[in-house]
UniProtKB/Swiss-Prot annotation:
It is found in: Cell projection, Cilium membrane. It holds the Pfam family TM231. One of its GO terms (cellular component) is ciliary membrane. This is Transmembrane protein 231. Glycans are attached at N193, N220. Belongs to the TMEM231 family. InterPro entries: TMEM231 (IPR019306). Transmembrane component of the tectonic-like complex, a complex localized at the transition zone of primary cilia and acting as a barrier that prevents diffusion of transmembrane proteins between the cilia and plasma membranes. Required for ciliogenesis and sonic hedgehog/SHH signaling. The keyword Cell membrane applies. Keywords: Cell membrane, Cell projection, Cilium, Cilium biogenesis/degradation, Glycoprotein, Membrane, Transmembrane, Transmembrane helix. The chain crosses the membrane at residues 23-43, 267-287.
Amino acid sequence: MAFYDVYAHPALIRYRTCVCTRATLFVCVVLGLTYISPLLVAYRSQGFWLKRNSYEEQPVVKFQYDLILLGVTDTTGNYLAWSTFPNFNRLIGDNLRIPEISAQEEDKNQDGKSDVLLLQISVPLKPAEQMFSVQLLLTFSYQLFRMSTVVMQTLAFIQHSSPVPGSQLFICGDLRLNQRTPLPHRGLHSTYNVSVIDGSSPFASTYDLTNIIRLYQQRNLTTHLSGVIPVWTVGRAANAPFQISAQIHYPVEMIDYRPGFWETIKFAWIQYVSVLLIFLWVFQHIQTFIFQNQVLPTITIPPFKQHRS
C-alpha cells in the first residue's frame, strides 16, 4: 500500500532560561540589532523622509483677453501700440493703432479643459510704415485642483525682431509653469489671484513691460512660453496689415509639492520594512544556530509531550 503526506506543520521547539543569563542578554542584543539597524540603514542611505514629491495634472487655463501690443515701425525707434487697458491707450496718443483680434480656445482631447489658444491679430499700418519688431504680453487665468487648489493670474510674453521688415509673425509654443518652491499638499493657494497689470492705474510706469516682468518674476509661481518657434514672413503688400498668429498649447504639468504627514510615514515605512525583512532572516538563522547547538546554555522543551509507558 502506498503512503503520501496529507498534511505537515513545523514542530515548535522552545528554549527556556532565567532572566539574568547570557542567553537573555543575547536575545536582547539580537532584538535591538534586528529592529534598530534597519532604521539606521534606511535613514543613512538618504531619502528616508520624503520632503518633496510630484504629480501630473492638466491645468485649467483660460485666456483673459487682456494684452499689451508694441511694435517698432522703423529703425529710428518709432513705434505703435495698443492694449485692452483704456488708461494705457490714452497714454499712447498718436501711436495708438487698434487691431482686429480673434481668439479661440480648443479642447483637443475632449477632457473638458482647453488645450490650445489660437490667437490672430491684424495690426493696421500706414503705407510708409514697416514692422521690424513685435512685443506681445498676454494674460491668463491658471488653476490647479488635484492636490492643493491653486488659483492665479499669469502671463505669457512674446518678443521677436528682425533687421528685415516683415508682413507676418507666427509663434508656436507651450505655456509652462515655473515653481521656485513646492506647493503644500492641500489647502487653497490664491496669493497670486490678482491682475498682473493694474488696468486702473493712470501712470505710464504701470504699463512698462520691464516693470511688469520684473515684478512678475518675483513670484513663486509663474508661467512662460517654452519651446517657442517663431516664423517671420517678409514681403508685405501696400496697405496690408501686419499679421500676428499665435498657437499656444496648455500641456500637462509636473507639479512639485510637499508631502503630508501620512504620505511621509508611508514612504518611510516601506523603506524600513524592506530592510527589516533582511535583518529578520539573518538573525533568525543566527538564533537557530546558537540555540540548537547550545552555544548558550538553555533548557530545551521538546515539541511533543513524553508519554509514560
